[in-house]
Amino acid sequence: MIREVVEAAGHQVVFAKALPLDKKVLSTIMQRMADGQMADLILTTGGAGLAQADCTPEATLEIVDREIRGIPEAMRAHMMTLTKRSMLNRAAAGVRNHVMIVNLPGKAGAVKECLEYLLPEIIHGVEVIKGEI
């Protein structure tokens, strides 16, 4: 679902892979991608709920230099108009080495809804981080 929405908005997906819910694996991959500047934006999906195995926000916050609290706040606020269970989402967002990292929900419909709502502002943020604006 991420690929479809991102490409429909005119952007390129350079890496997509299902990863295990393992904090060390997730943080290592995100860190390598950001430090290698493989992409301007890293989007994750899933692993931000309340299940014991959910660790994506912790993996993200462990590696970012600066947190961007407004993105997950806006995502939760928007999704609350559709389901109150959105308040249970623990997504995080931040910046590492001029690369933005954003955690998205795990369900395809929620990913689509969030990206369509947030992507213009996320792209603006990426441009600011890159010094393009």
What are these regions (language model features)?
Residues 1-133:
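Non-catalytic beta/alpha edge segments that cap or flank active sites
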